Regions:
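NAD(P)+-binding Rossmann beta1-loop-alpha1 motif at the extreme N-terminus of oxidoreductases
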Residues: 1-53
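Hydrophobic anchor at the start of a short beta-strand
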Residues: 3, 25-27, 92, 114, ...
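Rossmann-like NAD(P)(H) cofactor-binding subdomain of soluble oxidoreductases
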Residues: 48-131
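Rossmann-fold dinucleotide-binding core
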Residues: 99-100, 104-181
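Helix-loop-beta segment of a Rossmann-like dinucleotide-binding subdomain
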Residues: 130-142, 193-201, 255-266
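A non-catalytic, amphipathic alpha-helix used as a structural packing/dimerization or gating element
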Residues: 154, 158, 207-222, 274
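Active-site-proximal catalytic alpha-helix in oxidoreductases
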Residues: 172-217
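NAD(P)-dependent Rossmann-like dehydrogenase/reductase catalytic/cofactor-binding core
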Residues: 221-302
Length: 302
């Protein structure tokens, strides 16, 4: 199986490296500009496994012979991917979070169907240039089951062979959207506050974030069924529970706090703003509460 991984960031690098080295896939990397490949060092945080992978030269368009084009770009960059897929007939699998209108717009721009996916990998590149990542046991990479089936089942088998648990399901877009809108308010608050501790010590911001998260969950229930772990975690989230939870995580795995601050904070400010705007629009369209989401968005835009 030939897989074109579109997006050369940490997430795309983990999927590409594991599919190539352990999933028996021929992998190419598609980025904004063609450039030489490089040697990538990957470190799995949760079990200490390391992987050295020499990525091929990057290309600026997915190849005609690819079976799957795996989209791993930021939310605000999704529309810009369209020209990079103009030469391929591959099945388009999108791991980037999408709301239902996003998938419709993206499919229209491509002129063909788009398959929703949901990643299970957490990854970042550290200051030494290594890709550090987690494969949480409770998470699954979901790939939408479509008809006709195409290469989906084979792709899921390759992911599983690579060590990334994966499954097919029909409601992946709804599941992803419901989970995303539930968590984005907390990302918005982290972006506003600048750090986990800043959010936890700012009572007004924390209260606003939790109310916005409640509105996000309400919207999520309209869109679909969020991942079970997400629903359970957010249902019991409160100021005391969050402070205690952060304390436990920091004592056991301080690196995850740094990852959250880097990945969901100011570094992704543009993505946070665009996604927050889309969520407020969806809440307006679906008639769910949005007062706290709107206030938090206003603070995010400052």
């Amino acid at each position: 199986m030939r897989v074109s991984v579109v997006g050369a960031g940490a997430l795309g690098s983990v999927y590409a490296a594991r599919l190539a080295s352990r999933g028996a896939c021929d992998v190419e990397i598609v980025s904004r500009t063609a450039r030489p490949g490089r040697r990538i060092h990957l470190e799995r945080v949760d079990d200490g496994d390391t992987l050295e992978w020499s990525s091929p030269a990057h290309v600026d368009r997915a190849s005609q012979g690819s079976d799957v084009a795996l989209i791993c770009v930021r939310y605000e960059d999704l529309d810009g991917v369209v020209p990079r897929l103009s030469d391929t007939s591959a099945a388009i699998v999108v791991l980037t979070p999408m709301m239902p209108p996003d998938r419709d717009r993206f499919a229209r721009a491509l002129g063909r169907p788009v398959i929703a996916g949901m990643p299970s990998v957490l990854a970042y590149e550290n200051s030494a240039g290594a890709i550090r990542y987690w494969l949480p046991r409770v998470a699954t990479t979901w790939i939408e089951r479509v008809s006709p089936p195409g290469p989906g089942a084979d792709f899921v088998q390759r992911l599983t062979r690579s060590g990334i648990g994966a499954r097919l399901d029909f409601d992946v877009l709804a599941r992803n959207a419901a989970t995303t809108v539930s968590f984005v308010p907390l990302s918005m608050a982290l972006d506003v506050g600048g750090s986990v501790d800043a959010v936890l010590t700012d009572s007004a911001l924390l209260s606003l974030a939790l109310e916005a998260a409640a509105e996000g969950r309400e919207l999520g229930r309209v869109l679909g069924k969020a991942e079970a772990w997400a629903s359970t975690l957010l249902r019991f989230a409160g100021p005391l529970a969050l402070r205690l939870g952060v304390g436990v995580v920091r004592s056991r795995s301080p690196e995850i706090i740094g990852y959250v601050e880097k990945h969901f904070g100011r570094k992704l400010h543009a993505q946070n703003v665009v996604m927050a705007e889309r969520i407020v629009e969806l809440a307006t369209e679906r008639g769910t509460r949005r007062a706290a989401l709107t206030k938090l968005l206003a603070r995010l835009r400052r």
